[in-house]
Amino acid sequence: MRRVVSLLSGLLVVLLVLSSAPGAAAENWARFRGPGGAGISHDKGLPVTWTDKDYRWKTALPGLGHSSVCVWDNQLFVTSALDSGRQRLVFSLDSKSGKILWSDKLASRTHSKHQLNSFASATPASDGRRVYVLFSTNEDTVVRAYDFKGQRLWQADVGPFHNKHGHGCGTSPIVWHDTVIVASQHDGPSSIVGLDAATGKLRWKSDRQVRLTAHSTPVVLERKNKTPQLFFSNTGDGIGSIDPRNGNVLWRANLFTTRAVNSPVIAGNLVLAIAGGGGKGKQMAAIPVDQSGEVASDKVAWTRERNLPYVPTPLAFGNHLYFWADNGVVTCLESATGKDVWMQRVGGKYWASPICVDGKIYNITDKGEVVVLASGAKYQLLGRTQLGEPVHSTPAVSQGRMFLRTFKHLYCLEAGKK
């Protein structure tokens, strides 16, 4: 009996420790496209249609930015910019009330950019101890760390971000264990770097020959008893894999002749990436993740060149992939084979990427219409809701709340409201 009591007591201690750990009570949305960059939330009860009365709160955000919201526990982080990029802004908000808890400015320089980009397009990332933001110009790419009270902790410059077409920067930082990773892949000497999360000091640097500026954000695959892999994409390397512990290149598949804008996606034992640009068409390849060195074309699982998204990142959920193209054509495919399951034009133009919440797929048009589809082998439109403002930002979901960023406001939609 004493042994049983002792075991139960030990279990209680473990549960208490786990429940008191940061973010243990709910899944945090701590980077671009949430946990693992997969764009998937298991939160339940969020509506598929709603009205203005259903928002928990709505907060005006000064300036303009296309970054998405980073969420850790009850705190939100988002960026913006004023005065043609000369002032870059960081905001932290209370997720329950929408109240701005603190803000900070970073003096910067203006530069040319695509008319549909912003000077604050990189989504913040967090590890629960600090939040990390990224701003770039032609002369520098600045990563700055804050504590959750808004205190500046460190700042690092990982080099210029040149772009002969003047599109500006679109990649976001990510955090892997105690390393902040930034992919600075542009029209100049490029690299992917790992910074010490506590100090900002350089841990490793992997030089890349990019050829055309890439805006993709890397993703990390971790498996038991396997070397972790950081997947990235660009024109020079195609799809590549780096060891995030030291920056060593594990393999690369040089398959692309156009630029990578959306991000790599892990689908089962495959990693896939897309490249495209202008009137040059698009390219996509899916590759088994276990490779080494230079990957030959016969190692590629499948490829595709039609109905591909350029800016929106694909979504992998269950056994299916969802390509939500910029022109509003959505294609559902079998992940393993690339075989079409269904295809439907839902209308609108898209800069945001689709996310999946409790099996339902959400995306937002550039005019601010939220479109919700059912996941699965049969096309089903679940709802359409007008935000009434332009949108280029991907939704974020955490703790039963969805955060929708427009050009002017941040909206909070709560589960169970409708």
Q: Where do the protein language model's features map onto the residues?
A:
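Noncatalytic, solvent-exposed loop/strand surfaces
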Residues: 22-418
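Bacterial N-terminal signal peptides
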Residues: 8-20
